[in-house]
Curated annotation (Swiss-Prot):
Disulfide bonds: none
Annotated Pfam families: HK (PF02110)
Pathway: Cofactor biosynthesis; thiamine diphosphate biosynthesis; 4-methyl-5-(2-phosphoethyl)-thiazole from 5-(2-hydroxyethyl)-4-methylthiazole: step 1/1
SUPFAM superfamilies listed in its UniProt record: Ribokinase-like
Keywords of the record: ATP-binding, Kinase, Magnesium, Metal-binding, Nucleotide-binding, Thiamine biosynthesis, Transferase
InterPro entries assigned to the protein according to its UniProt record, in alphabetical order: Hyethyz_kinase, Ribokinase-like
Protein name: Hydroxyethylthiazole kinase
Any GO molecular function: hydroxyethylthiazole kinase activity
Cofactors (names): Mg(2+)
Length: 267
């Protein structure tokens, strides 16, 4: 059983989460952070990257609609965040789709220390250099062991690795968990994974480094449960209602609800 504490800390501390994210996800991510009690700051201007991370409690880097001028800003923000000691989350959206994305993520992983890397199976398989047929920015398909992919990424980059999907896989290289909550409606709305990465940033913001695995586990479980509850009673075509309902459920989440619905297995 989880011992949910980080959600309440977010609501009491209202951490500022710096997001360098994509144009598709920015609004949804900002509203989702507000729903859980965090405060979003969306900035990708190179001129601000020495300052904004110093004002923030976490940084989330998302390469979803990557533009060349943003890469240097991402690196500088990441280095500044490392310097001041706040956690950095990487969402390597579509990293396997193009050479530019692969090169960008390789540079980020070389120059920035990440507390967590969160993506779908295809994205983390690319980072782990495991064969997988990714489909653009979507997960695609493959036969690899997802738990092993998460383990490889976690060990290689000394971080928390999280793979989102029908089952979520979490690893810090030593501890491993699978989250069995969620809904098939998640991939039916754009930026649901991007919002999860932002939520992970908020949970890490109120945790100490030695608590990052537990914070990520609570973040991903809480988010999956919010989606599960938002989908109750909806038809598979009611994407708009799910979109709004997810924000509502994130705002209504409580530690009691998380414990009531959590379905987690450990390895």
């Amino acid at each position: 059983m989880l011992n949910p504490t980080y959600l309440q800390q977010i609501r009491s501390q209202n951490p500022l989460i710096h997001n360098i994210t994509n144009v598709v996800a920015a609004n949804f991510s900002a509203n989702g952070l507000l729903a859980i009690g965090a405060s979003p700051l969306m900035s990708a201007a190179m001129e601000e990257m020495h300052e904004v991370p110093r004002l923030s409690q976490a940084l989330v880097i998302n390469i979803g609609t990557l533009m060349g001028k943003e890469v240097d800003a991402m690196v500088l923000a990441g280095k500044t965040a490392n310097e001041v000691g706040i956690p950095v989350v990487l969402d390597p959206v579509g990293v396997g789709a193009t050479t530019f994305r692969k090169q960008t993520v390789a540079r980020l992983l070389k120059e920035v220390k990440f507390a967590a890397i969160r993506g779908n199976a295809g994205e983390l398989a690319t980072i782990a250099e495991v064969n997988w047929q990714a489909k653009g920015v979507d997960a695609g398909s493959g036969e690899a062991d997802l738990a092993q992919i998460a383990h490889i990424v976690a060990k290689t980059y000394q971080c928390i690795a999280m793979i989102s999907g029908a089952t979520d896989y979490l690893s810090d290289g030593e501890h491993h968990a699978q989250i069995h909550n969620g809904t098939p409606l998640f991939p039916k709305i754009t930026a649901s994974g991007c919002l999860l990465s932002a939520v992970c940033g908020a949970f890490l913001a109120v945790a100490k480094p030695e608590q990052y695995f537990d914070a990520m586990l609570e973040a991903c479980t809480a988010y999956a449960i919010a989606g599960e509850l938002a989908a109750q009673g909806l038809k598979t075509t009611q994407h708009g209602q799910f979109y709004v309902g997810l924000l509502d459920q994130l705002a209504h989440l409580s530690p009691e609800t998380i414990n009531q619905y959590a379905r987690i297995s450990y390895e």
